[in-house]
Amino acid sequence: MIEQQAGSRIRVEALAVGGQEQAAQWAQRLGLPLTDAHADFALQLTDEGLQLQQLGDDAPGAVRVDFVEGAVAHRRLFGGGTGQMIAKAVGIQPGIRPSVLDATAGLGKDAFVLASLGCDMSLIERQPIIAALLEDGLARGRGDRDVGSIIARMRLLTGNSIDLIRAWTGEPPQVIYLDPMFPHREKTALVKKEMRLFRPLVGDDMDAPALLEAALALATHRVVVKRPRKAPCIDGLKPGYALDGKSSRYDIYPKKALKPKAATDESGA
């Protein structure tokens, strides 16, 4: 059940015809009311999917996860492919597509980019509302002709990233990717809207040092931390090197060199 804190009270409502039953299911699953006259947010069932809408006169537009159309789809088609800085940061090279755990998945945008480039992705999102939006977006994208094969490479886990990483079973990821919540300075309207919506629900990641420590213990090859370009490194072990962009920076914590799969298979034979 989600704790209803001051300034972040949420109700669930159906805007789509016939969506009342599904709204009731989400409300029960998340422990949220279907009616609350004093709610600050509404988790809304619409014909286009699940969305989060801040309530009030000056509220920004709703946020919904959409991997098929909009900005995410545009980035998939025209974003630069393997030349993108995030691709370089996780170690994508000819013949190398590492398995990646995105332990701060958010709305899944970075994970989708990496999946579209061929990486097998695990995603962790600890905030239940954001995880619900992401789950809904993945479900809708799974049936799409163009992106269904990409979504098939994305596995969503919900819960505390530190706990899930420490209790990880099975083959560990080669790379763990972290983008802890930090005051963003990007000037796009979309980022502003999402940050404005999510900050009351999520706050800053005060446990980022513990998350980095857990990630370093699990990842077999490297940990990558995305930061605003001028932000300090996360407290703890210093990165081996960094990749700087216009607004963001990727701190790289290398453990072992990534190799093409064929070379890895031959060496293990």
Curated annotation (Swiss-Prot):
Q: Specify the domain of life of the species encoding this protein.
A: Bacteria
Q: What does this protein do?
A: Specifically methylates the guanosine in position 1516 of 16S rRNA.
Please give the family membership noted in the entry.
Answer: Belongs to the methyltransferase superfamily. RsmJ family.
Q: What is the lineage of its organism?
A: Bacteria, Pseudomonadati, Pseudomonadota, Gammaproteobacteria, Pseudomonadales
Tell me the SUPFAM superfamilies matching this sequence.
Answer: S-adenosyl-L-methionine-dependent methyltransferases
Mind naming one GO cellular-component term on file for this protein?
cytoplasm
EC assignment: the record states 2.1.1.242
Catalytic reactions on record: guanosine(1516) in 16S rRNA + S-adenosyl-L-methionine = N(2)-methylguanosine(1516) in 16S rRNA + S-adenosyl-L-homocysteine + H(+)
What is the protein name given in its UniProt record? Answer: Ribosomal RNA small subunit methyltransferase J
Task: Please provide the record's keywords in A-Z order.
Answer: Cytoplasm, Methyltransferase, rRNA processing, S-adenosyl-L-methionine, Transferase
- Whether rRNA processing counts among this entry's keywords is yes
UniProt xrefs under Pfam families? SAM_MT
- One GO molecular-function annotation for this sequence? rRNA (guanine-N2-)-methyltransferase activity
Q: Which organism is it from?
A: Pseudomonas syringae pv. syringae (strain B728a)
- Annotated S-adenosyl-L-methionine binding lies at 125-126, 179
Where in or outside the cell is it found?
A: Cytoplasm
